Amino acid sequence: MRFRPIHGFLAVILFAGIVIVADMAIDGRFGRPPYERVAAGPDGQVRIPLVGLEPRQVRFFHFLNAANQEVWFFVGRDAGGQLQVAFDASEVCFKRKRGFRHEGEWMVCNQCDKSFRLAEINAGGGGCKPVPLQHQVVGGELLIAQADVLAGWRLFH
């Protein structure tokens, strides 16, 4: 069988596909939870309804404003029902942009695999722990000021 130009083209395409899939696997893009898209309203507040957020449950969010500033964060309820809100990044591992995953009562860093109790997220602590996000609850709604969300933008650009 003779080597034809189409064979070289197919080999390049196959190799590129393998490289892309390997890069995605290394960066942890497979198996990540879906992010819900949010934006600030005219009042400058990001509003998230808390209906259906059960204890030991975490929801992940993606904020994008008109200036294309992207910020990822999560909202969860610990076993005691307390709300925990933090950026999906830590002070130590933020450069790899891999974030955290939720496992039961724990948040686990996708970069270094360190685990942190969901109930202790709002307390902060630095290091590889998720960076807490200022918030308030009014009625059944979580309110986060756009300025507070953008304060964490440095972790994502």
Task: Map each language-model feature to its residues.
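C-terminal extensions
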Residues: V58-F60, A119-G126
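Hydrophobic membrane-insertion alpha-helices, especially the h-region
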Residues: R4-M24
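Short cysteine/histidine-rich metal-coordination sites, predominantly Zn2+-binding motifs
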Residues: G104-D113, A123-H135
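Solvent-exposed loop/turn segments at secondary-structure junctions
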Residues: M107, S115-R117, L142, L150
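Surface loops and adjacent helix of pleckstrin homology
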Residues: D88, C112, A119-I121, A147
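N-terminal pre-ligand scaffold of iron-sulfur
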Residues: M24-R101, P132-H157
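Iron-sulfur (Fe-S) cluster-binding segments and ferredoxin-like electron-carrier domains
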Residues: R96-E103, K114-N122
